[in-house]
């Protein structure tokens, strides 16, 4: 009876291991299908790398009584470092309520340029000026 019991224990362990391997294999397939795992290690877009990057942004503009038009301007896209840590002792001595110290940077437009566009409207041609990002950088996050 001892051999039969140990055989069952081995079979149960084997089933548990194969289930674990199956789950891992399924996760790898899902990950690959979704595109989260890139075997080459390369990013599909420049903005997927850490930092703040200049990217083109195309949209259709509709102005009442004017012909709709498409325009491409530059925007900033990416991600910057942010974190929160328990406040250092010196900070707590100065302000006991300041328990957490946070640092954050946001992807932001640093400089812009004007893009003039001639738009055909019912009352004639109008010149409308759009802003386009010239440069981008990680900077202090602001509330607006």
From Swiss-Prot:
Disulfide bonds join 52-107, 66-121, 76-136, 80-138. Its main location: secreted. InterPro entries: Cystine-knot_cytokine, Glyco_Hormone_Alpha. GO terms for cellular component: extracellular space. It comes from the Eukaryota. GO terms for biological process: cell surface receptor signaling pathway. It is found in: Secreted. Residues 1-41 form the signal peptide. One of its GO terms (molecular function) is hormone receptor binding. Keywords: Disulfide bond, Hormone, Secreted, Signal, Toxin. Expressed by the venom duct. Belongs to the glycoprotein hormones subunit alpha family. Heterodimer with GPHB5; non-covalently-linked. This is Thyrostimulin alpha-2 subunit. It comes from Conus victoriae.
């Amino acid at each position: 009876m001892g051999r039969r019991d140990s055989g069952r224990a081995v079979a149960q362990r084997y089933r548990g291991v194969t289930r674990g391997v199956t789950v891992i294999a399924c996760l790898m397939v899902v990950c690959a299908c979704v595109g989260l795992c890139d075997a080459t290690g390369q990013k599909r877009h420049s903005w997927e790398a850490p930092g703040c990057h200049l990217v083109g942004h195309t949209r259709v503009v509709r102005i009442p009584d004017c012909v709709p038009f498409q325009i491409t301007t530059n925007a900033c896209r990416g991600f910057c470092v942010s974190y929160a840590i328990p406040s250092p002792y010196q900070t707590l001595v100065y302000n006991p309520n300041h328990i957490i110290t946070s640092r954050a940077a946001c992807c932001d437009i640093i400089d812009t340029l004007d893009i003039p566009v001639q738009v055909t409207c019912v009352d004639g041609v109008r010149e409308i000026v759009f802003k386009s990002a010239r440069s981008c950088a990680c900077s202090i996050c602001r509330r607006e």
